[in-house]
Amino acid sequence: MMDYTIFGESHGPAVGVLLRDVPPGLPVDEEFICRQLLRRAPQDPLSTARHEPDQVEVLSGVYQGVTTGMPVCLLLRNRDVRSADYDALRHTPRPSHADYTAWVQSGGRNDPRGGGAFSGRLTAPLVAAGALAKSWLKLQDIKVNAQVIDENALRQRAEEARQEG
């Protein structure tokens, strides 16, 4: 079973993921990983002003486009960083963010810029790891599907079915 550790901070040099127990011989399609990363990119100007290119760099565990069985390290450099935007928030935790929790956990030594290690930016390495896992699942002929349903409509259909007997 693959195991992963994400690393980096929102306004540090990079974020990334280290995957262990990746089977040897798994083809690594960097274009597929990039396409998956594009799906998590902001889709409208109101969500965030930050726009990262999200180009994945394979640092280890892959040779000639195939995993070697050693840990796979994927890196995404942070390029669109404006840390000064967070100067005023250094001593003021934002509501609905992990700022205060990070401050308590680190004894006040947390990186407050952009949420640090608790930023949405850390979803990028999770998506990269997921793309690699998805490639492995496909080779095993395992498909994962999901859908969003209207719970009220589902309850109504169930009630109608009960009434019909």
Give each language-model segment a name.
Residues 1-165:
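Generic N-terminal targeting/processing segments that precede catalytic cores or assembly contacts
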